[in-house]
């Protein structure tokens, strides 16, 4: 495969390098470095965890084998009775002594060594590879990884991926292979064949989920990204329901709800094949959500799925929300009986402001993180700081996640509560102190710097806000306004705003950065590969973003002459570019009328 390097720009990320054509032929988004770094961190933790689980299984199997051999030997010894012949008796006893001492050890050692050879390096499937950068980084940066299979149904992408595999040398060519095929067909034809399946599509992953949950090996890792955030956050609820089987709500917690909708959808697909998922990490970053789940097979454990799903009732007036479980369980003798959930958990009208409720879901209401995994991933990232290009960002996200309440779905927004009452907002530290002093738990959220997770009921939350307003009076509002209705009631709980030591998390107390700004302008989604650039893209993204996306205009890669050549042919790069004019304002129209 002959390649004219003058037509390409070399992009280096981590230990991998890829050749990107100066035309928009193959999709690449620099902003996804956060996604790729987080995936590598989780993959490293998965390989370590997988090895630990295998060692534990071997140890258990070895002990079991030893006990079986000892039992057989003891039974054999009892069956053989001693004879009157002293020589024969001594000879027989001596033989049995050797067997009793050495037999179990040898059998256990043999079983251990035999099982040890069964653990092979994990096979990874990147279902939608595009340039192959992610697959190359997996192969070059993750120790102990096996074969990496990169798929794409676009010939230009597969050609680019194969070119990049060769460009990265022998290590990549020996581990990474690229195929032109439909990812869904490939996954369906390889059931339980991959230890890791990575889905990172352009848009919704819904059409790949059914085949993905079948392709993951038992105990394997499924990594899935969804970038259709407008759909998942309630802009088109009917579209979200058709894709994911859940109805979204427009709340301040909509991005976390998007995570939980995606998890519920994956669980639904897995249940059809007597499988279930265990989330280890769920992240909302930049313009997408990303979940990491392990997939297991168990018909009995699958029955617990309704206990992990809930409907959400959200008041249209004050944004109070309540969760109702889809199912419940009752212990019955030595078994468990599964029953429908009891509801509704709310009346027709909100008890706080008198407005109606919107109902959404079902969503995943069980924990979306495994705190042991999160701490392991975070420690691994800190120990390999130089190997993560986006170290600061992923470390900040993981730090915030490690301090979240794992068993509290969704969160409150302090500014939203204050906006409902039209009052000044208390500081986060004061509000958290009031919640803790009321004997409830509270934490932040990695999704929103203003988000507050707590197990306190909404009655306590509004009582705290009523007490705050009493000390910080506001102007009278319309009696029909939700805030006026809430404030018309006397608080049943007197809030204590004295500062509590737990009002600040450990990261906050140490002043560790938790929410970082974007590193550069236009840090977000990019134009789909091969799409014609129109005036709409220019107006939305700007000339700098569009041209930078197409040309991969990195000044450090070229000299001054190349920079001048890149500035000239804007007409060739952007088709249908409009003449730049200042849009008329209302003052202009008034002056011409």
Swiss-Prot record:
GO terms for molecular function: tRNA (guanine(26)-N2)-dimethyltransferase activity; tRNA binding. It catalyses: guanosine(26) in tRNA + 2 S-adenosyl-L-methionine = N(2)-dimethylguanosine(26) in tRNA + 2 S-adenosyl-L-homocysteine + 2 H(+). Residues 9-465 form the Trm1 methyltransferase domain. Keywords: Metal-binding, Methyltransferase, RNA-binding, S-adenosyl-L-methionine, Transferase, tRNA processing, tRNA-binding, Zinc. Residues 558-577 have a biased composition (Acidic residues). Dimethylates a single guanine residue at position 26 of most tRNAs using S-adenosyl-L-methionine as donor of the methyl groups. InterPro entries: SAM-dependent_MTases_sf (IPR029063), Trm1 (IPR002905), tRNA_met_Trm1_C (IPR042296). It comes from Arabidopsis thaliana (Mouse-ear cress). Changing residue 200 to A: Loss of activity. Residues 68-81, 88-118, 578-587 have a biased composition (Basic and acidic residues). Belongs to the class I-like SAM-binding methyltransferase superfamily. Trm1 family. The lineage of its organism: Eukaryota, Viridiplantae, Streptophyta, Embryophyta, Tracheophyta. Residues 56-118, 546-593 are annotated as: Disordered. This is tRNA (guanine(26)-N(2))-dimethyltransferase 1. Its EC number is 2.1.1.216. The keyword RNA-binding applies.
């Amino acid at each position: 495969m002959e390649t004219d390097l003058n037509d390409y720009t070399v992009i280096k990320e981590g230990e991998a390098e890829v050749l990107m054509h100066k035309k928009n032929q193959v999709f690449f988004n620099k902003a996804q470095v956060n996604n790729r770094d987080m995936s590598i961190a989780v993959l490293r933790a998965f390989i370590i965890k997988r090895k630990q689980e295998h060692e534990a299984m071997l140890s258990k199997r070895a002990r079991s084998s030893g006990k079986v051999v000892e039992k057989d030997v003891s039974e054999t010894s009892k069956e053989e009775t001693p004879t009157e012949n002293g020589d024969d008796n001594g000879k027989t006893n001596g033989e049995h002594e050797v067997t009793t001492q050495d037999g179990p050890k040898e059998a256990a050692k043999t079983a251990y060594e035999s099982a040890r050879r069964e653990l092979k390096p994990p096979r990874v499937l990147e279902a939608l590879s595009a340039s192959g950068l992610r697959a190359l980084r997996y192969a070059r940066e993750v120790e102990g990884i096996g074969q990496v299979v990169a798929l794409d149904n676009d010939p230009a992408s597969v050609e680019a991926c194969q070119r990049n595999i060769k460009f990265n040398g022998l290590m990549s060519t020996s581990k990474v292979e690229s195929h032109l095929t439909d990812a869904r067909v490939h996954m369906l034809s390889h059931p339980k064949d991959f230890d890791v399946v990575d889905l990172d599509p352009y848009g919704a992953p819904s059409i790949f989920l059914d085949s993905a949950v079948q392709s993951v090996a038992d105990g394997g890792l499924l990594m899935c990204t969804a970038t259709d955030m407008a759909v998942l956050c309630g802009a088109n609820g009917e579209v979200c329901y058709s894709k994911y089987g859940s109805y979204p709500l427009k709340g301040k917690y909509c991005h976390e709800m998007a995570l939980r909708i995606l998890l519920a959808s994956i669980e639904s697909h897995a249940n059809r094949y007597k499988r279930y998922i265990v989330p280890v990490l769920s992240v909302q970053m930049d313009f997408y959500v990303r979940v990491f789940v392990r997939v297991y097979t168990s018909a009995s454990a699958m029955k617990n799925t309704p206990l992990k799903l809930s409907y959400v009732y959200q008041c249209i007036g004050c944004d109070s929300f309540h969760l109702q479980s889809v199912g419940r369980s009752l212990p019955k003798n030595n078994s468990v009986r599964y029953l429908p959930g009891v509801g509704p958990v709310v009346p027709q009208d909100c008890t706080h402001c008198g407005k109606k409720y919107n109902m959404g879901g079902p969503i995943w209401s069980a924990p979306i993180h495994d705190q042991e995994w999160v701490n392991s991933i975070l420690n691994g990232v800190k120990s390999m700081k130089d190997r993560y290009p986006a170290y600061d960002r992923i470390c900040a996200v993981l730090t915030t996640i490690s301090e979240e309440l794992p068993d509290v779905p969704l969160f409150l927004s302090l500014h939203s509560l204050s906006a409902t009452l039209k009052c000044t907002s208390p500081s986060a530290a004061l509000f958290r102190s009031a919640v803790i002093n009321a004997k409830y738990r509270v934490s932040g959220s990695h999704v929103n710097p203003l988000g507050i997770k707590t197990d306190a009921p909404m009655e306590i939350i509004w009582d705290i806000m009523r007490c705050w307003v009493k000390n910080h009076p506001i102007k009278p509002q319309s009696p029909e306004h939700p805030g006026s209705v809430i404030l018309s009631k006397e608080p049943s709980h007197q809030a204590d705003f004295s500062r509590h030591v737990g009002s600040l998390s450990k990261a906050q107390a140490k002043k560790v950065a938790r929410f970082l700004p974007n590193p550069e302008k236009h840090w977000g989604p990019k134009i789909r590969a091969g799409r014609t650039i129109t005036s709409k893209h220019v107006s939305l993204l700007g000339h700098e973003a569009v041209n930078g996306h197409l040309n991969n205009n990195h000044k450090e890669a070229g000299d001054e002459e190349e920079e001048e050549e890149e500035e000239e042919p804007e007409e060739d790069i952007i088709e249908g570019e409009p003449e730049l004019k200042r849009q008329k304002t209302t003052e202009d129209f008034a002056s011409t009328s």
